[in-house]
Curated annotation (Swiss-Prot):
PANTHER family: 60S RIBOSOMAL PROTEIN L7 (PTHR11524), LARGE RIBOSOMAL SUBUNIT PROTEIN UL30 (PTHR11524:SF16)
Intrachain disulfide bonds: none
Protein name, per record: Large ribosomal subunit protein uL30
One biological process term in Gene Ontology: translation
Stretch forming the signal peptide: none
Example of a GO MF term: RNA binding
GO CC annotations, alphabetized: cytosolic large ribosomal subunit
Family (UniProt): Belongs to the universal ribosomal protein uL30 family.
Length: 177
């Protein structure tokens, strides 16, 4: 009898780059580039796999991160989602690919129904929807936060803004939309 592997659902983390490019060490710059955090105030949403967590911990002094919830992710997709060609992500575009709303996509990603938010070419059979949003850019450009930041030199645990902040990342994201 063959054993079926159970799919592991990792938590989803929002990672926001808060510090700029000058004087960034090469290994940190490479890791930020691999995470697609190439500019200040850019956000990516990633699964919490051990390799991704290791990368985030390496760039901990340049980013802030925490668990994103479905409501915040739906708002980000609605207001800041872009598709290739720098066009906004619209409800009509989602419906063309079989999704009914931004909330449905966000919930499917957070619960692990889909593995990735963005992908390139997708072949979908009729009556099925793709396992992602085709041609969605894998990062989100945000505004600087309303009300400003406390300090980009101190960690969140000591009154700054860098490092792990848990579910409080959702408040920061809403201030940056």
């Amino acid at each position: 009898m063959m054993e079926t592997k159970e799919k592991v659902v990792y938590p989803r983390y929002a990672v926001i780059r808060l510090r700029g490019i000058p004087t960034t060490p090469r290994d940190i710059a490479t890791t930020l580039h691999l995470l697609r955090l190439r500019r200040k105030f850019t956000m990516v949403v990633v699964p919490g796999t051990p390799s991704i967590i290791g990368m985030i911990q390496k760039v901990n002094d340049w980013v802030t991160w925490g668990e994103i919830d479905a409501d915040t992710l739906a708002e980000v997709l609605k207001k800041r989602g872009r598709i290739v060609g720098d066009k906004p992500l619209t409800l009509e575009y989602l419906q063309k690919w079989g999704w009914q709303s931004f909330e449905e996509v966000a919930l499917a990603y957070i619960t692990g129904e889909i593995d990735s938010l963005s992908c390139r070419k997708v072949r979908v059979r009729e009556g099925q929807r793709p396992p992602c949003i085709p041609y969605l850019k894998p990062f989100f450009r945000l505004h600087p936060p309303r009300g400003g930041l406390n300090s980009v030199k101190l960690h969140f645990s000591v009154g700054g803004d860098l490092g792990y902040r848990g579910p409080l990342i959702n408040d920061l994201i809403r201030r940056m939309l």
